Amino acid sequence: MGIYIRDVVKYVVLVYILSMSRILISTMHRGDNYGSALQVYALSEILKKLGHHPIVLDYIPKRINLNKQVWGLLKQLFLPKSLGDIKGAIRGLAITLTNYRCYNTFFKREVSLTRKYYSYKDVAKANILADVYMTGSDQVWNSTYNHGIDSVFFLKFAPEQSRKISYSASFGKEKLDDWEKNETKKLLERYEAISVRELSGKGIVNDLGLPCQVVLDPTFLLNKEDWKKRSLSHHEKDKYVLIYSVEPDKQSVIQVARFIADKLNTKVFMVEWGHKPYAGVDKMISLVDPLMIIDYFLKTEFVVASSFHGTALSINLCKQFISVAQARFNTRVKSILEIVNLPDRLVSPAEFDLNKALCSINYSEVTQRLNIARENSMKFLKLNL
């Protein structure tokens, strides 16, 4: 009898799995930053909640290929020009490999992945079958960032008659260069439904003569309570201002954070992938599980962000924050701040005003706007899946 019941349960589970739509997501998740990891995690969680079976295409472009990074460091180690090169290579190898293991553990635990692919040719040859092919979020359509148009992120490998949609894709800039307009249009014409993350992205797609909708970044599809339940706790006792920046030059961001921390009588913590020490920072947060980063956001007194996801998480988790303008690609941050009516939270270091920065954000209006945008974003997914 027990064996019979187990067989019935297995059969029911199998039927349920087979009834789920298999969605292949092509997104930028291997960028070695927490925002990229959290956005694909959130999208997968929501698609599962909607009754689908999301699978992430484990595509690793050349520019972020671990083998290439390790080979470069080994070359520096065995063909050094100075003692500093040797020390730097050893440190770099330790950090790179630990960082890879950290993200790999997270992805294996939380997200369904295909095998690894390293080129469009490899993906096209694989003939991966799915009910829906989806371009996911982050700067998948940014030709500057991707060193050209990356056909994998435009689903060129998907069968011609297959269903293709995008969710919260980003061009990361205000307009396309002339050289990429025709090819981008041809690739997007194959899509059944297009949604982008920024208002400027909608303008780009509309200018190509195609319909488009603005939706929220996937991290917003999980609300504050959702993230609280999923976060991994840290055990810091000190109060702190949190820096979340992906900018290479962090000195101006640190200076701003230091002003705020001194006023609030707190320490300064900074999320930094390589444990590199910075003057003015009391603690580096690095090589931890992406879901622990959420807890650092939840428990901070204030966030100084200089990235899209640093800004997005601050808003979604209802934190007091400012977003320091980056050297480029600020359109991403401007767009989300406009959606929640917080344009004044974007500041340049040269125009930083401590008193304005510390003006408290009233999250009642922000939450209302966010809930409306979240509902519209969910409607897009439900309608097109």
Question: Predicted segment positions?
Answer:
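Active-site anion-handling motifs in enzyme catalytic cores
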Residues: V8-L385
